[in-house]
Amino acid sequence: MKIDYYEALGVERTADDKVLKTAFRKLAMEYHPDRNPNNPEAERKFKEIGEAYETLKDPQKRAAYDRFGHAAFENGGMGGGFGNGFGGSGGFADIFEDIFGEMMGGGRRRSNGGRERGADLRYNMEVTLEEAYAGKTAQIRVPTSITCDECSGSGAKAGSQPTTCTMCSGSGRVRAAQGFFSVERTCPTCNGRGQIIKDPCGKCHGQGRVTQERSLSVNIPAGIEDGTRIRLSGEGEAGMRGGPSGDLYIFLSVKPHEFFQRDGSDLYCKVPISMTTAALGGQFEVSTLDGTQTRVKVPDGTQNGKQFRLKGKGMPVLRQAAVGDLYIQIDIETPQNLSKRQRELLEEFEKLSSQENSPKSAGFFSRMKEFFEGIGE
């Protein structure tokens, strides 16, 4: 029985190219013969999804299939060269390589003489909040792989040259039969290099690279946040056999601050003041990250938790001219270890206090009294 190509891929008839490609890749992973050895059913399904995708990925074939179904491909219905088999030039093998090649050996590195891009590196750096505020230039030392200066990266001893691998003809890839189609694999003779080194370099032992610690200057811009990533292009490991270098990624973390807490570009802090300052009014000074001392006026009758805003005293916004604000929360301290005279004065103050001095507490206890008296009636 003929299969429905859309059902085979599990997609709607309106599916676009991206949906088709995603569906094919997912099913190809599930039913690939390498993952299902000696499983005829998986091989059958794998062939069906390959047939379906080869037809639907081609706009002309898809249009014909949508209009005529499988009849479009029978008895030469679409003219010469329009069959849906998986013949020698291209066909399903090429589809599989383009979409799914990494399953066959870790990515497509072919037709490049074995050149390989160097690995990316990660470097973790911790900065203070003050450094995050102002920015800085940091010197770091990174252990990495660099091109061997003895052999200039060839891996071969001075005076000798690598020879082209005869198994893959220098491509680093070989074709292997896989049931009804063929796929490319990494050449087992040269391990994908495309070259054979008979007389390796004594310094790098044929690798073309040596490990060395490098010193780099890193610009940390003002306003960076915890988790900010900085990319230094080409500062990763050196490539293999003439390949490009990888990149270096600096991952930044900001140390917790003793005084300030941060939320985006805004800063928050708590400032303790005495009970008398809160009641009578006064002022205090706070040090800000720009290095200045800012005087804050406290009005009389200030309550615990009162918040003051200092505009433009927060953190700079990364790569922008904007600056956040500083929010100061008042924390009123209750006096401790009172002297006899201090206690006498507070007791006298308590006797002279009225509801107007503490309207919230007086109102609260009055309402509480009324509540419990109402329960007893």
Swiss-Prot record:
The keyword Zinc applies. Transmembrane segments: none annotated. InterPro entries: DnaJ (IPR012724), DnaJ_C (IPR002939), DnaJ_domain (IPR001623), DnaJ_domain_CS (IPR018253), HSP40/DnaJ_pept-bd (IPR008971), HSP_DnaJ_Cys-rich_dom (IPR001305), HSP_DnaJ_Cys-rich_dom_sf (IPR036410), J_dom_sf (IPR036869). The keyword Amino-acid biosynthesis does not apply. GO terms for biological process: chaperone cofactor-dependent protein refolding; DNA replication; protein refolding; response to heat. Binds 2 Zn(2+) ions per monomer. A zinc finger (CR-type) spans 135-213. Disulfide bonds: none annotated. One of its GO terms (molecular function) is ATP binding. Keywords: Chaperone, Cytoplasm, DNA replication, Metal-binding, Repeat, Stress response, Zinc, Zinc-finger. Its cofactor is Zn(2+). Zn(2+) 2 binds at residues 165, 168, 187, 190. One of its GO terms (cellular component) is cytoplasm. CXXCXGXG motif repeats lie at residues 148-155, 165-172, 187-194, 201-208. Pfam families: DnaJ, DnaJ_C, DnaJ_CXXCXGXG. Its main location: cytoplasm. Residues 4-69 form the J domain. Zn(2+) 1 binds at residues 148, 151, 201, 204. It is found in: Cytoplasm. The J domain is necessary and sufficient to stimulate DnaK ATPase activity. Zinc center 1 plays an important role in the autonomous, DnaK-independent chaperone activity of DnaJ. Zinc center 2 is essential for interaction with DnaK and for DnaJ activity. Belongs to the DnaJ family. Participates actively in the response to hyperosmotic and heat shock by preventing the aggregation of stress-denatured proteins and by disaggregating proteins, also in an autonomous, DnaK-independent fashion. Unfolded proteins bind initially to DnaJ; upon interaction with the DnaJ-bound protein, DnaK hydrolyzes its bound ATP, resulting in the formation of a stable complex. GrpE releases ADP from DnaK; ATP binding to DnaK triggers the release of the substrate protein, thus completing the reaction cycle. NCBIfam families: DnaJ_bact (TIGR02349), PRK10767.1 (NF008035). Homodimer. This is Chaperone protein DnaJ. It comes from Brucella anthropi (strain ATCC 49188 / DSM 6882 / CCUG 24695 / JCM 21032 / LMG 3331 / NBRC 15819 / NCTC 12168 / Alc 37).
